[in-house]
Each structure stands twice: as C-alpha cells, then as structure tokens.
Amino acid sequence: MRIAHASVLAGLLMANACAVAISTSADNISRLERASAAKPESEAAQRTLGIAYFQANRFAEARAALDRAAAMDPRDGVVALYRGLTAEAENDVLGARSAYEAYLLYGTTRDVKAQIAERLVIIARKENELAAKEAIAREQQLARVPGSPRTVAVLPFKFTGRDTSLAPLERGFAELVATDLSRSAQLTVVERERIQALLDEITLQQTVGVEAGTGVRAGRLLQAGRIVGGTISQLDSNQLRADAFVTNVQTTATEGRGANDQEALDQLFTLEKNIVLRLFTDLGVVLTTAERNSIEQRPTRSLAAFLAYSRGLELQDEGLFDAASRSFDAAVRLDPTFSAAQQRSRDAKSAAAGARVSVRSVQSRLRGTREGAFVAAATQGGVSATNAGGGGEAFAIADGLNPSVAGGATSGSGVTPTQPQKDPSAGTGGDNVSTKTVTVTVVIHHP
C-alpha cells in the first residue's frame, strides 16, 4: 500500500518555491531596514521590510516584521498573505491557517484568494498530520486520560476475497458505518481524516484493516472511548459477509455480542444497515424514531457508483487527489444523485489545486494588481505609504480596470503608473450590473 504524504510534499513545494521566487537584493533590504528604523511606527515600512525578508528566505525576520505590521493594521491583506506564506515556510501550520483566513477576509486579489482557499485544504491535512505526531509524542500522558465512551472511532475494515476490485470497500463500508453511527445524538464519531492521518503515522495501514481487539492504540491516541472495526469477506462471487466489533479502549475488551451478517453483493447497503443497527445495541444506544428513519437512507442505489466512490476514498488517502477526483466523478456519472460523491469530488479537486499552489504561483497572480504593487515596492527597496488593508470588491474591480498601477509586482519594472495596460472601455468582469451594483445616495438638506 502506497502512502503518499501529500501535505508534506506540498509543503516542500512551497518551501522550494521560496528559493526561486522573486528575490530582494541585500542593498534593497538594507535600504528598507534604514527606513523601518527611521519610522518604526510605520505599518507600510514594516510590511515592506517583512516581504523583502521573506523573499530573501530570512523567515524569522520576516515573521517579526510582518507581526509588527499586523499589530498596527490587522486588516492589511498583503501582510496577512505574507504572514501565511512565512508560517508555511517555517512549518507553522496553525499560524498559516490563521493568516490565510485573514487574507480571505481582507485580501483584494480574487485569483490569489481562490488559491489560498484551495491551499487551506492542504493545510487541514497538515493539521491532522501534526495532531497525529503530537498525540504519539504525548502517548503516555494520553493513556492516563480515558476517552469518553460516547466518542467512537470507526477504523477501516479488512477485506478478504478473490475479487480485488472489492477491496476499496474497506474504506467505503467503514464510512457508511461511521455516517450512520453519527446520526445518533448520543455519539461523537471521530472524523475520518483524523483517523487516517493517525493510521498513517503509526503505520497501522500496513495491515489495512483493524479486527476485533486491535487498534486500541489508535483509539487511545484519538481520545476515543471505543473503537469499531471489523472484516468484509467475499464468500463466493456473489456473497459478502461482514463482521464488526466494538472494543473498549481502556479495557481492550470487546463489548456486546458483535455484529455480523451475510448478504448478496447487490444487497451491500442492506448488509451495512443490519450491521450498524446491531452496533448501536452493543454501544448501548437507543435510537429515536427520527434517528432510526434517517439510518434507512441510502447514499446511492448503484453498487458500481459506490465502488467507484470507495476507490476514490482509497486514492484520496494516498494523496492522489487528481485520480481520486476522477473516481468520484465516475461515481457521479453512474448516479447523478450521489451527493456524497459530488462533495468528495469538489474536495479532491480543491486538494489537487491546493497542492499545486506555490510562492511563485501566488506572486504570479499578484502581478498587475493593487496588492502586487506592495510586493514590487519590497522587491525594489521602496516603501509604499499606501494602506494595503482590505478594499473588497471595489479594489478588485479597480485592479481589473487599470492594472498598470501595480504592473511591476513581479517584473521589476517599478510601481509608478504610466499608461493603462487595458482599455477601460473593454470592461473588467466587474462591470456586470446584474451582479455588481454601486449605489450613490445624495442627501440635500433644505435651508
């Protein structure tokens, strides 16, 4: 089983891109340092110096300058963006998330905001990996604090059988069980992504699934009181058997009688429903009528669509986001009403795009924008006194109308505007009156 730590690879891409992105000369940095020392209260001076340090791969100094700028103006979108890039370069995942989210609030360059939104998908994966590492580092401490018996982790099932095309059911079947268990208000089900990150970290994935009595370490690290695991067996070409067990993490004992059933392959969803209802009994959960009815919902009526979906989950776990999105898309083609596959496809596409985001690609999208002018100023050793706070839609439209204001963002051509690079009469995409309206109210006071 290949385990591709996509977010680690993506982080390396971001870090490597720093070395090939726009650089700032030592002379320019010295000039900016003098300007900052002369006006330590200037947010613009701190912002420009921080960007220059970042471009020179002097990340600790960049962080300090950008933090000072952010304290002076928390609404400065450019500062938020470069704080996020700096945090990623320093492997500060939480800091990167906070800064990127601030950029989504206050940034004005639409293309870059789209990139950062996609990048946050990768940041979320990195957060799960970080949490897994921290949990393992604190394992002895966590072992002394038992998880709540109402917190349940559903681990991948183990498939055995001749038809390897059914192997992705290890993930798909486990997700069905987790989804149905989460329909009870009495239980808290651990997110699948957290579980997978931990399994990767402690190499439980080597055995793929988790049978009764095993995986207790994973449950302890997840602070789950109980874990659910089991097997799916292909008895012949058309019959499946599922066995599932509830294990108490603290005592390592199996609770209840276990759940098992056997059905024809095309009755996979009936098989899962029978299993999960028995698991509720073993978990000591009495369902309400509404909860019982919701469990009867089926994600799809197409077995082929669900197999494609399960394969997508497998590929997603391996960090193969493009391939995963194709599998999810195949599931949607087989069943256009398969909403879970639609959502997973969107998520996989965002993750694939986010993994490709780099410092170079971000700065390329800044070229020719108002925000890009501040980057150009740092590159050339000049300080722009203009505030770079969030200007919202108005600034985004203005950037499209006359991008020459910031035409030197990455070209080194300066930041002083000359002639517009775009005929204002050509439109900007922001002049569609059906979607963007400006209201001017004139109040005249009578004498």
Each model region followed by its residue ranges:
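Amphipathic beta-strand/beta-sheet edge segments enriched in Tyr/Trp
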Residues: 80, 91, 98-102, 209-283, ...
